[in-house]
Structures are given as C-alpha cells and as structure tokens.
Amino acid sequence: MPDVQLDVISIDVPFPGASPGEVESGVVTRIEEAVRNIEGIADMRSYSNPSLARVRLDVDTNYDALAILDEVKMAVDRIANLPGSIENPVIYRNQRQQRAISVQIYGDLDEVTMKGLVSTIQDEILSLPSVTKADIQGARPYEISVELKESRLRQYGLSLDDVAKAIRRSSLDLPAGSIRSDFGDILLRAEGQAYRKVDFEKIMLIHKSDGTRLTLGDIAKISDGFQEAQFYSMFNGKPSIGISVFAVGEQNQINISNEVTDYVKTRSQTLPDGISIESWGNGTAYLSESINIMVSNMTMGIVLVLVILGIFLRVQLAFWVMLGMPIAFLGAFALLPLADGSLNLLSLFGFILVLGIVVDDAIIIGESVQTASERDGHSLDNVIRGAKRVAMPATFGVLTTVATFIPLLTVPGGFGALPAAIGSVVVLCLLFSIIESKLILPAHLASMKPLQANDHSPLRQFQNRFADGLKYLVEYKYRPLLIKSINARYTTLAVFVGMLILATGFVMGPYIKTVFFPSMSTDFIRAQVEMVDGTSPAQVVKVIERLNDSLVLLNEEQPEDDKFLKNIAAYVSNTNGNVIAELKPVDSLSQSPENIAVNWRNSVGELSGVKTIQINGAQKSHGHSKDINFKLISPNIKELEVAAELLHQHLRTYDGVYDIENSNTGSIPEINLKIKSSAEALGLALTDLASQVRAAFYGVEAQRLQRGREEVKVMVRYPREERESMGNLESMYIRTRDGDEVPFTAVAELETRVSPSTIRRTWGKRAIIISADINKTITQPGKIVDDVILGDFALQLAQRHPNVRIELGGASQEEDELTQRMLLTTTLALFGIYALMAIPLKSYLQPLIIMGVIPFGMIGALIGHIIVGIPFSALSVYGIIALAGVVVNDSIILVDFVNKSVANGMDIVEAAIKAGTERFRAIMLTSLTTFFGLLPILTETSLSAQLVIPMAVSLGFGILFATVITLILIPCLYVMLNDIKTMRIRLISSRSASSES
C-alpha cells in the first residue's frame, strides 16, 4: 500500500500513578488551552487515561502539518504549571508504519532469560543491511524494585523518600573536571553508578560514628526484574516474545523481509533446546504475490489491447500506436517519485487502469491517418493531414480526461491515499501520451511503407474480412439505427433518461448493495477483548486462553484439506487482550475469513467479565475500528451520560447493527484522600499526605539508568503484600515535617467514589463516543447515520437534552468529509472540463451537450456491479469519475467532426449521421481497448485485487455503455441543440414581425 502520512499531531504525556480526573485537570486542560488558538487545527480530541494524557490534533488540509507541529511543540514548552511528576511530553506527527514481517521467539523459558535472548536477536536483526526499525512486542519493560516494609522503616527512622535520596547520592557517575598539568589534562571522574541488584545492595543508608553500618540490602528486598504489569504472551500455545520489523520511508519491504527470513532460518540452528524462532505475518509475501498478479494482468491487458488494435488497424500502425504505451509508462515511472508516489499495489493498478486509455489519443491519430491513407493513398502529406485533422480535439480530449482524475488526488484522510496513488499514475501517463502522440507517432506513421495491394497473407485476409464486416455493421445496422434515433430524437432522449432513472432506482433499492467504505478480506482474523474495570489479571488470561483454544479446536475439527490455521498469537495487557490468527492463503481456504470469524465467535459463547469483544475477519478500508461513530458533547456530565445511554438503546433497535460500544461504560473505584483539620496543628498539608501515600503505593522513582538499549527505572515502595488492601492504607504512618510519626487515620479521612476509566473531550468539552459495527448485507452505515442525525431521534434528543450536541466521528465523519470534498472537487473538475471543451469546439453551448451525457455513463457502471456481484462503494464512484473523462474524450472527437462538416456546408442531420458512421471505428476502438485492458482485473479473484475491482468495474462496463451514448445520444443532442437554436430564431423573428406590424 502507499505510504500514508496522516495530518494528525499527537501529544502524549505520561503521568505515572494519576487517575483520569487528575490527568484531565492537571495536564489535558492546560494543553488544550495552550494549543486551541493555533491556526490550522481542524479538530482537537483528548483522552485522559490512568497515568496517561493524550491529545490528538487534526490539521486542516490547507495547512502545512510540519509547521503546525513546530507551533504545537513551542506552545506545550511554554506551559509553566504542569505537574512536576509528569514525564516529558512526546509530540509527534502520526504515521502509518508498514510492517514488513514479524519474528516470534517462543518456548519454555523464564521471562528474564527469554527477554535477554530476544534483546540479543533484536540487535542482530537491526544489524542486517536493510533493517532500521525492529520493535520488541509482548514484553514488559525492565525495572529495579526496592521494597521496604513499614516496620523496618520505622525501626531505623527512615522514610521511602530518604531511601530514594540515598540511592541518588550513592548511585551515580559524575564528571569532576580535570587537572591541567604540564603533561596535559587529566580528567577527573566519580564512577559509582549501580546497575545490578548486587550494586544496589551495597548502597549505604546509615553510617554511625561507632562504626554501625546499614546498607540497602540489609533492610530492603531488591528485585532486578520487570515493571508490575500483567504479562501474557503466547505463540502457538507457548510463552513468547515477538519482534516487529518495519519498513521506514522509502525502504524496500521485500528486501527487508528476505533478509529477516534468511536470518531466522540461520538463527534457528543456534538456539537452545526447547526454544524456537519463526517468522510470520510476512506482508511482503502478499506484496510479492500482488505485484506478480498485477504484472501478469498488465501483460495480459497489453496483449489484449494489441490484439484489438491489430484487428482494426494495420499491423504496423497498431505497433506504432502500442509503442506509445511503454513511452508513457516510462515517463510516468520516472516522474512518480517527484509526485510523492511509489511502486505499490495501487500504483500498479493505475498503470493497468490507464492501459486502454493511454492509447486513445494515439488510436484517434492513427485511425485518422489510416482513413486518410485508405482514401487518398499513403504519403507524408496525407499522414500530416490525417494527424492535423484530429490533433486539436484529441489533445483537449486527453486534457479533459486528466481533469476528471484530478479529484482523485485531493481526497482527504488516510482513505484518500488509495485513489491518489492511482490518480497520480494516470495523470502522468496521459500527459506523456500527449507528447508521444503529437510529436513522435506521426513520424513513425510517415515511415510506414504503403499497403501492398497484392498482400494475401492470412492476417491481411482476416483484417480485410473484418473490415468488410465492420463496414456492413456500420452501413446496414448502425446507420439505420442512428437515422431512426435522430428522427425520433426526443423519444431517444426519453429512453435514455428512463434508463438512468431505473439505474438510480437500483442503487436506492435493494438490488445493488451500497457501502461507502468496502471491507477487504485478509490473511488474518483478530479478536480484541476489553474487560470490565477491576477484573483480575487471572480472569483476563482465562478469557484470552478460551478464545485461543476455541479457534484451535475449530481448526482441528476441520478435514485435513480444510484446515485454515497457520499461526496463532495471544497477548494480554492490563484489562485488554488480543488473539491474532494467521490463516493459510485465502485463495486456498474452503471458507472465507469472515465466515471463520463468525464461527469462531459462535463457538466461544458467553464470556463473563467482558466489556467489549470484536472478532473481525475483514479489514476495514476506512482504517477505523467501527463502521459508525457518534460524538455526544456537553458541559453537563450527567445530561451527557443520559443522552449517551438513550442513543445506545436507539441503535439497538436497528437490524444489522452489532457490537455497540459506549465509551462511558468503564469506571474505576477511586479513593479520595482528605486531610483532617487536626493535622494542620502537626504542620501537615494535603501535599505531604498525598506524596507519602503515593510513595508507598505507587513508589518513588529514585533514578533511571541506561542498560543497553533500554532505560530502567529504579522504584522505591512498599512490598506488594503491604499495598493490596484498604487495611494497608489505613495502617500506614505519616511522617510530619518534624520527623514524628502519626497513624494515617489520625490525620486523614477517605472518601470512596467511582470515576470513568477514560475521560474524552472534544474542543475542551466532555464527550462520549457511541460506535457500532454494521452487517452490510442487512443495512447500510449511511442510512443509519442519516436516520440518527436527520431523523426523529435528533429532534427527540434536542427536546430532552438541549445542552447535548451530536456530531459524527470516526468512519462516519470521514465519510461525510469525503462526500463533501468529492462534490467540491468534482464540481471544479466539471468547470475545468467545460473550459477545455469550449476551446476546440469554439462554442459555449456544445460543451453542455457533452457534459449532459456524463450521468448516463453511470448506467453501464451499475449494470457491471450487478453482473460482478460487488457492492457499490466510494471506489466505484472514483471509477465513474474516471469514466466521465473517457466519455468526454470520444464525444469531443465526434462533435468536432460534425462542426467541420457543417462548416463545409453540409446539412446538420447529414453531418451528424456522417460523423457517427465515419468515427464509428475510432470510437469503438478506444472503448474496446479500455475494456479489454481492464478485463484481466475484472476476472481476477485474488485477495490483492479486492480494492481495485470496483473502479475497474465502473470504468470497464461503463465504457461499453458509453460507446452507445457517444454513437447514438450525442448526435441526437447535437441536432436537438440546433432545434433549440432554430426555435429561438423563429421566436425572435416572430416578435420582430409583430412589433413592426
């Protein structure tokens, strides 16, 4: 896929140990105020999670995201009142990374040894020539934990903060200047940094004058291990840690994948017994297959186009026409990097899409030259005359096609990268085709030898028979039909309008399924689980194991030839879990990944303690987790919660709506500390109380040290058994500023409450997100969205909760933005097409005739979707937009021919008939080359073609029907325009006569 640079800026601020409410008030609100007035920010969303603040800024497409990023960094740096315990803010521009391959190390090995081995393997992978980014997945960060019991601290009159300060004093490396001697400078340095458990045990806490010494190892339990977090990572049923290898920037994914695969094969021979290493999720295998499929389809398309040209035209002429294709392709390929393009699945399809179109210009020139040569003989003058006759309309015809592809380059969002990758290739190819057909092709055609009259070769005889058959078709089938259509031109128009209305009805009705964002089958199925807050780690693991085992059992129940499972991985993090299954190639499966996902979900049954679960066998092309998404915004939190529940229940009334999620359903039990008035007499303030409780239960960060690639925190805190209950809190002692110790209950009181697990805000106001998935075989996301936003529910919500505002979010918002942008850019493109047609036609009215037939091209596209059996989507619309350019291209040639005949004194009706019959071969040829160039893709069943087939169907089938439009409807409309002019002249004449009388 093309590299996607999203116009989204993220601000992540870790706030260790803080509740969502503290994160909101202490960090999020201050960042929002600092950045809200920066020009160019289109949307601002924030998420206050336990221990983490996240702010997401959408950049307006009319602004430079990198410039906005710099402004955001400066604005955040200027905030002076952020809490002191936060970590450094991380500010970056979002970018979708291309995962090339994953490596999994698994087996029966303890966590410490396993991570050490994985770190070594990570270093070895990063040393490969093509690899620059390889991240460890499914492993906890290292941490040195210093745990001291309350009783031991009291025994020696120490506090946790005292211990942390002692570590900072003794564990450090400090440069101490230098001695400037006559023999040179001698550096002075104190080296005492502790790195391992044994080093920390020797740190001195107390050293009395009588020689009594107390070290950290005497009173503390020191663990050189991992952070306190839930850890569960399995691969094919065994403990595992993974490494994800990414392609960065313009790196070649295939080279990276090949190097890593070769490394894994070699490294597997040196691992200890019981430990395995395996590469999986090889995205480049899919890429290589896709490239091979696209190249084979391109080759087949070229052959088919050449065959069609060889049937209609002289073989030499067909060859020179075809030569324009590689010239245009090479030119586009050379300039593609300058247009921020790359060689990927979609750009390859762009070359296939333009196969038949790129030769249209050359076909028109070549066919005109052949016609002139057949009529007047082959000579340089006749070649020039034939080329000049159609040069002007052919050039502007290609330019109008270019104009129709411009909207594909301006689609916003991540989804916009798909049509943009195609459009950039097509535009470059078409521009090069103009140069080739006008400057190079005529010279080649002039160099051809005259056709030999005594040529009786089988090919020439076949061409003669075909030419005779074509003449018969034109004279005895097409010409009479055209005459009848022109004579009954208003009836003909009515028939076409009726067909258009009928086709539109098919879209609006149940006959053609419509989805804005089509789903795509993949080689993976995924289960994502979020547990209710407060769920024990053991319960989360139990649910993930059940999901894992149920899929393995489902696979084992299949006959040997129908087994679908290749690899399966499971991960748990706090209250979330994921199971990812790699399937065998989709083409070899007896059932679709979507069906496997449904069967998996049914086999699992009810899962206790699960807040949300998603099992997907298809990838959503819009890139969002849900198909529909609504944002409810209000300053009144209670009213907001009621409105959110109302919308949640309303969505449950629709058929086909499932996995409805309410972002406000999660909650965390919270204990609020309050200081008693009696504590003030002891010199205690709330900050003293809070800091000591935080030190005991979260810990004091004594220092951070660098060990190899990882930064390791040194945390000082109570032992785990003294942090597990309310009793532990109530039994702790608080130290006054004078050094005295008082019971916690004597100076503090507790207030229990519940707070949301995540606080969402939009433009500084609280927001709740209601989202859901849609079964597109039952209903359409757009219909649900329109009904909620524009229907009775919106009125009911406004009446009951006037302070609550409802907006679209996620995929729904992107669909709305895409629709608006498509309407705007398509309208501008139509104005551009009109201007480009007005120049060669030298008329303001005749371009309207041609533009009037553009909607009729949709009829063939819709018929194609019915035949192929695919839903009508946004990608289908892009195909119709491209179709408009081809329709206009052929129509300009026809109308220009009529104009020249009329200018020579021919009757308009006769001129229209002559134009149709004489341009029949050229128009038929351009249409057939376009269709047959796309035919291999239209018949493709592979996974890699799913994204591009809707565009190919719209353009391929649409162009066949567009041929009928051009050859029948355009002549009728031309004559009808003359009727209107004649009627206007008569009306003016009659008025003049009346005024004179």
PLM region spans:
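Hydrophobic transmembrane alpha-helices and their membrane-interface caps
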Residues: 303-311, 315-366, 370, 428, ...
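Transmembrane alpha-helices and their membrane-interface boundaries in multi-pass membrane transporters
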Residues: 355-369, 391-410, 417-464, 579, ...
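Signature of alpha-helical transmembrane segments and their immediate interfacial
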Residues: 388-390, 461-516, 630, 917, ...
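Flexible hinge/switch segments at interdomain interfaces of large molecular machines
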Residues: 1-9, 45-51, 86-107, 135-141, ...
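Helix-loop junctions and hydrophobic alpha-helical segments within the transmembrane domains
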Residues: 280, 287, 291, 366, ...
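Short helix C-cap/helix-to-loop transition motifs enriched in small/turn-promoting residues
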Residues: 32-44, 62-90, 122-131, 166-175, ...
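Extracytoplasmic/periplasmic membrane-proximal domains and adjacent transmembrane bundles
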Residues: 9-12, 54, 80, 124-303, ...
